[in-house]
Swiss-Prot record:
Protein source organism: Strongylocentrotus purpuratus
Assigned protein family: Belongs to the complex I subunit 4L family.
Compartments it resides in: Mitochondrion membrane
UniProt membrane topology term: Multi-pass membrane protein
Main function: Core subunit of the mitochondrial membrane respiratory chain NADH dehydrogenase (Complex I) that is believed to belong to the minimal assembly required for catalysis. Complex I functions in the transfer of electrons from NADH to the respiratory chain. The immediate electron acceptor for the enzyme is believed to be ubiquinone.
Membrane spanning residue stretches: 1-21, 25-45, 60-80
Protein name: NADH-ubiquinone oxidoreductase chain 4L
EC number, UniProt record: 7.1.1.2
InterPro entries per the UniProt record, alphabetical: NADH_UbQ_OxRdtase_chain4L/K, NUOK/Mnh_C1-like
GO cellular component: mitochondrial membrane; respiratory chain complex I
The keyword Transmembrane appears for this protein: yes
Amino acid sequence: MALLIVILSMFYLGLMGILLNRLHFLSILLCLELLLISLFIGIAIWNNNTGVPQNTTFNLFVLTLVACEASIGLSLMVGLSRTHSSNLVGSLSLLQY
């Protein structure tokens, strides 16, 4: 029960971090990583408690999506910092021009 509270608090901290820190792109990426890692840990513990060891492929799929999201986010941040010399989210819409 305590582990469930820890995982839910990690999830809500990541969600609140995304909602409250919308100024810098790097802080949004870090909060999104916290959100997705807590989701991964929750799914892994749920699969362990159900006694079905065949669901580990879904855990690897979620972890792969987290890694892809991180690489795409970091590449967007590098492009943003090279073109506009800042990592502010308000400059992100200017990348399309």
